[in-house]
């Protein structure tokens, strides 16, 4: 039976000698309606290969198995990973790895389980302190994954899906848009977890896409990160450590932007145009 009540989950964890660890962001989802909404949002179909990051007690794992997905669950906590075996069947629909996801051989383990041009999906209740490194690791794997459906802090979800001109818009937003199409799914109240965290969470779905061509990503992201380190400054000031300010102003004019523009008003497409213009002038 799914563990949807705080009292049931507390008893389950106590029997295992587990006391939720703040350092591991162990806040477990206990709302069955939310679990089903996550499965629907991720559009998991029978036969899909799903990488589940941090399954915990396994309520979401069980919901995905019920729609006949093939789940590869990666759980760092040894006891919780061991207890997930209660969902295993002879069909090997569930495979469990007790590992840190950032040390897990994602390509090696998943590629061998995919058929032809099939792609896997990622579903994760991301540890709050590891949200950025895990997303950075997964979102670049377009050839392996079709989508990521992640639970993150609500304020992080706003940053992930912000539009130019909004206060939450950042270099992180641009990075995600470079590799995917992020979409805000829905808010998840802190009361849907045990123990309840201090803030609400949200579901974000990222549909992975081909990154823009003819761009050195490392150089491009150096520009966007540098620009947003001083987001209230004009680009010609915030990027002066990389380019001559007059060159930045000229490039902004050429791409149809105000020479006094700040980074928060430029879209991904605008930054791409700026990148090409700046490096085009470098070559001449």
Curated annotation (Swiss-Prot):
Function: Specifically dimethylates two adjacent adenosines (A1518 and A1519) in the loop of a conserved hairpin near the 3'-end of 16S rRNA in the 30S particle. May play a critical role in biogenesis of 30S subunits.
Enzyme kind, highest EC tier: transferase
Family membership noted in the UniProt record: Belongs to the class I-like SAM-binding methyltransferase superfamily. rRNA adenine N(6)-methyltransferase family. RsmA subfamily.
One annotated Gene Ontology cellular component of this protein: cytosol
Organism classification: Bacteria, Pseudomonadati, Chlamydiota, Chlamydiia, Parachlamydiales
One Pfam family here: RrnaAD
InterPro entries: KsgA/Erm, rRNA_Ade_diMease-like_C, rRNA_Ade_Mease_Trfase_CS, rRNA_Ade_methylase_Trfase_N, rRNA_adenine_dimethylase, SAM-dependent_MTases_sf
Gene of this entry: rsmA
Protein name stated in the entry: Ribosomal RNA small subunit methyltransferase A
Coiled-coil positions: none
Location(s), subcellular: Cytoplasm
Single annotated GO MF: 16S rRNA (adenine(1518)-N(6)/adenine(1519)-N(6))-dimethyltransferase activity
Highest taxon of the lineage: Bacteria
UniProt entry keywords in alphabetical sequence: Cytoplasm, Methyltransferase, RNA-binding, rRNA processing, S-adenosyl-L-methionine, Transferase
Binding annotation for S-adenosyl-L-methionine: 27, 29, 54, 75, 100, 125
The enzyme's E.C. designation: 2.1.1.182
UniProt catalytic activity: adenosine(1518)/adenosine(1519) in 16S rRNA + 4 S-adenosyl-L-methionine = N(6)-dimethyladenosine(1518)/N(6)-dimethyladenosine(1519) in 16S rRNA + 4 S-adenosyl-L-homocysteine + 4 H(+)
């Amino acid at each position: 039976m799914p563990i949807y009540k705080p009292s049931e989950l507390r008893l389950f964890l106590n029997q295992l000698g587990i006391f939720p660890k703040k350092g591991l962001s162990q806040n477990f989802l206990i709302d069955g309606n939310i679990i089903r909404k996550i499965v629907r949002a991720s559009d998991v179909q029978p036969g899909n290969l799903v990488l589940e990051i941090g399954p915990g007690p396994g309520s979401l794992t069980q919901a995905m198995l019920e729609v006949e997905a093939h789940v590869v669950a990666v759980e760092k906590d040894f006891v919780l990973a061991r207890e997930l075996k209660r969902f295993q069947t002879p069909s090997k629909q569930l495979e469990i790895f007790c590992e840190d996801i950032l040390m897990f051989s994602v390509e090696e383990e998943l590629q061998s389980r995919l058929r032809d041009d099939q792609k896997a999906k990622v579903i994760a209740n991301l540890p709050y302190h590891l949200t950025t490194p895990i997303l950075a690791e997964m979102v670049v794997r377009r050839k392996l994954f079709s989508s990521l459906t992640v639970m993150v802090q609500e304020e992080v979800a706003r940053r992930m899906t912000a539009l130019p001109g909004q206060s939450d818009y950042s270099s992180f937003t641009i990075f995600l848009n470079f590799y995917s199409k992020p979409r805000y799914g829905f808010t998840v109240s802190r009361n849907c977890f045990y123990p309840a965290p201090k803030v609400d969470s949200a579901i974000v779905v990222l549909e992975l896409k081909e990154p823009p061509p003819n761009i050195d990503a490392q150089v491009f992201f150096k520009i966007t990160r540098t620009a947003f380190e001083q987001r209230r400054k004009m680009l010609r000031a915030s990027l002066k450590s990389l380019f001559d300010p007059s060159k930045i102003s000229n490039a902004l004019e050429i791409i149809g932007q105000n020479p006094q523009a700040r980074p928060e008003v430029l879209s991904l497409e605008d930054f791409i145009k700026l990148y090409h213009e700046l490096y085009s002038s470098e070559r001449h």
